[in-house]
Design a protein with these regions (language model features):
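N-terminal beta1-alpha1 cap of cysteine-dependent amidohydrolase-like domains
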Residues: 1-72, 76, 83-90, 94-120, ...
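Catalytic beta-strand/loop module used to bind and position nucleotide/cofactor moieties
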Residues: 161
Length: 198
């Protein structure tokens, strides 16, 4: 049965996300809502988050969380999850953003993320906002050497967030010097298979 994943549409280019979802046999649906809930929700990278998330994004995350459907947050998406669960963000952290391309840096991972990418993955990042105070129910699973949070999981829900960009480091885009981003999307596939909707 087809498993659809809603990619939250923030008006950006989602080609890499769509390609990697198809590579793990998931069907991407780009929009701010779908007819009924999909099997999973993907919150992609994007622009800055102000003090509050847009109401339609809050409603969408709330619907997927209430239905215990898997949610994957990438870069801005991880930050959005943290804000949704009551956390806060630093407006600007140095050393994690460049004008073009990504910064590669070493991290430490534990728990679910260590199972996916190992305990000392090198990851690709490009961001200037970062988690300050962690949201309710969230646990840190990955850190950069400077202490910036690079990965989170929810204690009860199938929610995973990464500050880095696995879609730029998976399948045809994979570079040998960084963690295999495909593992994150295989996680989403496994979670979607456990899900009856989509």
């Amino acid at each position: 049965m087809e498993k659809r994943v809603l990619i939250w549409d923030d008006g950006l280019n989602y080609v890499n996300y769509m390609e990697v979802l198809r590579a793990v046999d998931l069907t991407p649906v780009v929009g701010r809502e779908a007819a009924g809930l999909c099997a999973a929700l993907l919150l992609p990278g994007g622009g800055d988050i102000a003090d509050r998330l847009p109401e339609d994004e809050i409603r969408t995350i709330r619907a997927y969380a209430a239905a215990e459907k898997p949610i994957l947050g990438i870069c801005r998406g991880m930050q959005a999850l943290n804000v949704f669960f009551g956390g806060t963000l630093y407006a600007r952290v140095p050393g994690h953003q460049v004008k073009a391309g990504d910064i590669l840096h070493d991290t430490r991972a534990v728990g679910e993320l260590a199972e996916l990418v190992g305990t000392a993955p090198r990851v690709n990042s490009n961001h200037h906002q970062a988690i300050c105070r962690l949201g309710r129910g969230l646990g840190v699973r990955q850190w950069a050497a400077d202490g910036v949070i690079e990965g989170i999981c929810h204690s009860r829900l199938p929610v995973l967030g990464v500050q880095w960009h696995p879609e730029r480091q998976a399948f045809a885009l994979r570079r040998g010097e960084a963690a295999d981003g495909a593992a994150v999307f295989w996680w989403l596939r496994r979670q979607a298979e456990k899900n009856s909707g989509g």
